[in-house]
Amino acid sequence: MLKLFTLLIFLTSLGSLEDTTSNESLYDIKIEGIDGNTIDLNQYRGKKILFVNVASKCWFTYQYDQLQELYTTYKEKLVIIGLPCDQFRNQEYGTALEIKTFCRLNYGVDFPLTSKIEVKGKNQHKLYQWLTMKSKNGKKNSSVKWNFKKYLVDEKGELIDVFYSFTKPMSKKITKLI
């Protein structure tokens, strides 16, 4: 009886050795666009996606020029999604209209922008949970410590790499992966 009990415990413990990574797909996540409409990431299957947490009053705001250039250059195979965030020294405008107007008038931004989101903390958006947690993205853990951190995802919705704020959008580090 003891042998049978030991065998049952052993077999039960094997189940806990299974891969604990999430099967949640990036494409299951929805984001509110800057105009209030839902952005369904599923529409971007087959294209790479560069996610960038942006802020209009940040030292890195100049990167909007290169983000727009990158988007225009690789539009057939890449989408850039700018995600306004106010978590780093309140460097984003208050309303969606202010953000959208600033980006369009000053930088000619025509890639998708979302409503303001939280990229860290207890109210971290589901997208950023996926981007920053290996248990969800299957590749690596990371944290967002400042504006203009970039996450590149491939055509199948798998994380390729993460780039810090100092990495310019048109750098070879990014363009060679597109």
Q: What are these model-predicted stretches?
A:
Residues 17-42, 62, 126:
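N-terminal "domain-start" segment that seeds a small globular fold
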Residues 47-48, 57, 61-85, 104-107:
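Conserved helix-turn-beta segment immediately C-terminal to the redox Cys motif
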Residues 126-129, 133-178:
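Thiol-/selenol-based redox modules, centered on thioredoxin-like
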Residues 53, 77-94, 109-121:
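Thiol-based oxidoreductase modules, predominantly thioredoxin-like and allied folds used
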Residues 33, 53-57:
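Amphipathic alpha-helical repeat scaffolds
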Residues 97-147:
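Short, internal strand/loop/helix patches
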Residues 4-13:
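Sec-dependent N-terminal signal peptides
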